Structure formats: C-alpha cells, structure tokens
Design a protein with these regions (language model features):
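The feature captures the beta-strand-to-loop junction immediately N-terminal to the Walker
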Residues: 53-55
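Helix-to-loop junction immediately C-terminal to a conserved catalytic motif
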Residues: 68
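ABC-type ATPase nucleotide-binding domains, specifically the catalytic core motifs of the NBD
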Residues: 72, 98, 102-117, 125
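Conserved ABC ATPase signature
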Residues: 135-139, 143
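A short, proline-enriched helix->beta-strand linker immediately N-terminal to the Walker B motif
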Residues: 154-158
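Catalytic Walker B motif of ABC-type/P-loop ATPase nucleotide-binding domains
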Residues: 160-164
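Conserved H-loop
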Residues: 189-195
Length: 222
C-alpha cells in the first residue's frame, strides 16, 4: 500500500509529495479512551532506520500497524513509500508443514519469475544455504528468525517494519542476527522502522530515535 492515507476527518497532507519517504503528519492515536500518541509528525527516508522505544502499552505496535495500513483508527495523515511493506515479528510465524525454501517462496506471487531462485538467494544471504529443505521444527530459534528475515526481504519491500525480532533469543545470538539484518538493510534502499525494548539494540541500528511516552500521548525524537 502506498500514497497518502488519512485518518477520519483529516485534510490531506498536500504539502508532502509522494516519494520513497515514510511521512506521518499530525498522527493522533487513542485506544479505549487513552491518548497514546499526540500529533506525531516525522519523515523517514530510504536507507534510514527509525528506532522506536517505549514502555509496554505506549503504542509501539499500534504505530507499526498504522504505518503498515493495517489499522485506520487514528487521526492525521500517513504517506507510505511506493512499493511493498514487509514485516519481521518477534515470532517467525513460519508454516510448520513447509520447508525453509517454501516458507520464503510463499510470500511471492505465483507468477513471480524465478520464484525458487529468489527464495534460495535470500536464504543464502542470511546464512542458511545448507538448511533450505529443513522444516521449522528442525531449526533452532535463530534459524527460524533468519528464515523470517529472508521471507521479508524476498518481496523487495520499500518499507520494512521490525517488531522486537530478537527479544526471545539469547544476547550473543540476538546481537549477531541484529548485525546481519542491519547489514542487509544497509545494502537495500528501503525505509525501516524498528521497534525494540533494548536501548543498546536501538543505539546500534538507528539513524533516528523515536520514544513514545504513552498516555497522555507524549513522544520525543532524538
């Protein structure tokens, strides 16, 4: 999904031109009468990583869903980059009856030229060249998360949304996967928004930091 999207009753963000940027203009978010985000305005360009922090319930995942166009329960305007949006979640969310290769290929359209080649290429890039035919139950947690990264990047996204991807892994493995994903993002001209509770992780990957204070909607950009 791309272009300008508006929350209920808002004027268009006419002053922004459609481009490769992710733009939020005066985004206001309530949940069950709680004011989570108050008039957030920001822009993230290609090749940049916006790191998002905040306490549980502050609205981090809700903000990702707004950026993705999954939820429309907000006021304000969102301009998304032209192209696909991809996710990397805390849980890999792989289909247990499919191999690594087929889990990655599943995100590609049936008529995608070289579908299996694309899946294999990305599995190689995340270090799983020898594990393409393994099923999720045969993989470690780190391997499953690498498949999830390959699956997201195989779609050639313009916008990558990353939600606590390594919080369930031990610190050395989490650090290695973080560095791998950061390197992949650096080689791709895409906009990335990365949510984490780990300040060290966000320090390592962020071009810009957004902290959500939660109710009554405060936030700050570093």
């Amino acid at each position: 999904m791309s272009g300008v999207e508006r929350g209920v009753g808002q004027a268009p963000a006419a002053e922004f031109t459609q481009s490769a940027d992710l733009v939020l203009l005066d985004v206001d978010v309530y949940r069950r009468s709680l004011h989570l985000i108050d008039c957030l305005t920001l822009a993230v360009g290609p090749g940049r990583i916006l790191g998002v922090s905040g306490a549980s319930g502050a609205g981090k995942t809700t903000l990702l869903r707004i950026m993705a166009g999954i939820t429309h329960d907000y006021a304000g305007s969102v301009i998304r980059p032209e192209g696909r949006t991809a996710f990397v979640f805390q849980e890999p969310r792989l289909l247990p009856w499919l191999s690594a290769r087929k889990n990655v290929g599943l995100t590609l359209a049936p008529d995608t030229a070289g579908k299996l080649f694309i899946a294999e290429e990305w599995l190689e890039r995340v270090g799983l060249a020898d594990a393409m035919d393994l099923y999720p139950a045969q993989m470690s947690g780190g391997m499953r998360q690498r498949v999830a990264i390959a699956r997201a990047m195989a779609t050639d996204p313009a916008l990558l949304l990353v939600d606590e991807p390594f919080s369930a892994l031990d610190k050395p493995l989490a650090r290695a996967l973080r560095d791998d994903l950061r390197a992949i993002v650096a080689q791709s001209d895409l906009v990335t928004v990365w949510v984490s509770h780990d300040p060290g992780e966000l320090d390592a990957i962020s071009s810009t930091r957004l902290h959500l204070d939660g109710p009554p909607g405060g936030w700050r950009i570093d």
